């Protein structure tokens, strides 16, 4: 059986990136939660 994690930056950014978060209501809620916690990195795309 192959391993499930096959890294790809493009897929990673498209799924978890900033623009992906902004695009949906729930994604914006994620960003709001992370801003409230004062996270230094809101999403994986702006490391």
From Swiss-Prot:
Biased composition (Basic residues): 31-41
NCBIfam families from the UniProt entry: rpmH_bact
HAMAP family: Ribosomal_bL34 (MF_00391)
Region (Disordered): 24-47
A GO BP annotation: translation
Matches recorded under Pfam families: Ribosomal_L34
InterPro entries: Ribosomal_bL34, Ribosomal_bL34_CS
UniProt keyword annotations, A-Z: Ribonucleoprotein, Ribosomal protein
Record carries keyword RNA-binding: no
Keyword hit for Ribonucleoprotein: yes
Organism per entry: Baumannia cicadellinicola subsp. Homalodisca coagulata
The protein's name: Large ribosomal subunit protein bL34
The organism's place on the tree of life at top rank: Bacteria
GO cellular component, one term: ribonucleoprotein complex
Molecular functions (GO terms): structural constituent of ribosome
Family from the record: Belongs to the bacterial ribosomal protein bL34 family.
